């Protein structure tokens, strides 16, 4: 499956991230059953990563690049685009499909 992007609320439909730009995001990460495992919103601190530098899972790289600034979306990410057979011990089980509620706040 890879990553499926479902728009929750639209962005500007003009400003899309490019490689080597820093994406400033808010997110909530959940397992497929809805169990939350992480949230930048809970910390009230946006998360930043540079696109194309493999700082995040493949599902984020391929999902966020499809978003425009201001857009909020649901990313459903298959295990092979997330943490695969290993998972993330104590947080994400092996072979887990992940669901993220993400918002692209701005680009730097």
Curated annotation (Swiss-Prot):
The keyword Protease does not apply. One of its GO terms (cellular component) is cytoplasm. It is an enzyme of class 5 (isomerase). GO terms for molecular function: peptidyl-prolyl cis-trans isomerase activity. Disulfide bonds: none annotated. Pfam families: FKBP_C (PF00254). Belongs to the FKBP-type PPIase family. FKBP1 subfamily. This is Peptidyl-prolyl cis-trans isomerase FKBP1C. It comes from Homo sapiens.
């Amino acid at each position: 499956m890879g990553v499926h992007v479902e728009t929750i609320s639209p962005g500007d439909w003009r400003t899309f991230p490019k490689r080597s730009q820093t994406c400033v995001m808010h997110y909530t990460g959940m397992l497929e059953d809805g169990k939350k495992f992480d949230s930048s919103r809970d910390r009230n601190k946006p998360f930043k990563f540079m696109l194309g530098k493999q700082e995040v899972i493949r599902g984020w790289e391929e999902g966020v690049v499809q978003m425009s600034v201001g857009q909020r979306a649901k990313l459903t990410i298959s295990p092979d685009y997330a943490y695969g057979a290993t998972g993330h011990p104590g947080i994400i089980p092996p072979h887990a499909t992940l669901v993220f509620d993400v918002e692209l706040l701005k680009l730097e």
